[in-house]
Amino acid sequence: SLSNFKNNHGLANSRARLRMTTLYQVAASNNGIVVGTGNKVEDFGVGFYTKYGDGGVDISPIADCTKTQVWEMGKSLGIMKEIIEAEPTDGLWDDGRTDTNQLGMSYDELEKAMMDKTSEGYSKVSWN
């Protein structure tokens, strides 16, 4: 069982990779493609994705949108309020930790840090 591995981060990344292979099987079975959900903050701002996991997609239609823009898009499309306001999580951990727990900052703080180098959050982000 995967739960016997000691490296929890490795286990979470394995789950993302298994999810990706499942999505590719479903897509292939339906003559489809895998559409990414990564946004500007996650993918390009802080690199919050699993290589060969949730980063392994055919197209990334919202890659240039901030998380705030994605939420606004959802509202304009009539997506349920409960979905838009749900705390973001990658769903890879058994303890239900949120993106904010893992990143140490909210998406609002990350967006401000990406846009304004003088913001308080900018110094908290480890820029490569």
Where are each of the predicted segments found?
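ATP/NTP-dependent adenylation/nucleotidyl-transfer catalytic domains that generate, transfer
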Residues: 1-14, 24, 28-33, 37-41, ...
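Active-site glycine-rich loop that binds ribose-phosphate moieties when present
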Residues: 16-19
